[in-house]
Amino acid sequence: MQYDCSGSWLNAKRQRINCHKEQGHGTQTLVQAFANSCNPYFAQLVQSEQLPLSRVIETFTKMGYAVNGEKGKRLLMDGITASPATVTLADPKDFDTQWGCLGQGDTLISPYQLMLWQTAVASGTGKSVQPYVIAAKTDAEGNRTEQTVRQSSEQLFSATTAQAVRDVMTQNAAAYYKDSLGDYVCGVKSGTAQIIDHGEEYENSLLVGFSMQETCPVAFCILIEKRTAGELTTASLAKVLLDALQDMT
């Protein structure tokens, strides 16, 4: 599926979706648009008949979203609970729905849930790995007792989808994050949220991903609020995190 990005796009209701690249990305495939974080591409995809909104809602619900006010399933980790992601998807031709499908607008989600999805992608199974806080206990005599058993979730999306997304994310990391992440074999996706708060405009910078290193198989989610261009990046923080975890092994 190909769509054109000229830097800005008007939907069926004459509402404008802007791209972060003012001159546009030109004609793109889905994989290219994913790597480019191209808003107009995905807005056109949502509006098209190639991707029915009912299918989007079904997929989002399986992934754990509470869609259109429905009560979602709370997330658990060793007795700790977190609220599920929420989003409103009402009209595929409307800005709010198109923006919501892009993770913008009134979409809310926790870093915890984003990392669960990353484990489902990294494993190539479409099932997330259940995390835990304490792996084992060691008593005063040095006897170690394991506290956990590896558990997986129900199917969030197909293994085929998981493997395809994993390939795209690892290609994205290799192409654009080699200088930041060094020799780590990772899959990553960045995101930027434009915020207007009491007249103040700023950006929140996000990076989600996973490491494929056998010695450091982790998922991560890094957020810098009110980030200033030229300062610390989410990718550089990811490198510090992975280095620290590697040193622990």
What are the functions of these language-model segments?
Residues M1-I222:
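Beta-lactam-recognizing serine transpeptidase/beta-lactamase-like catalytic domain environment
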Residues N143-S152, A235-T249:
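Short, gly/Ser/Thr-rich active-site loops of penicillin-recognizing serine hydrolases
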Residues I224-A235:
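A short acidic/glycine-rich loop-to-helix N-cap element
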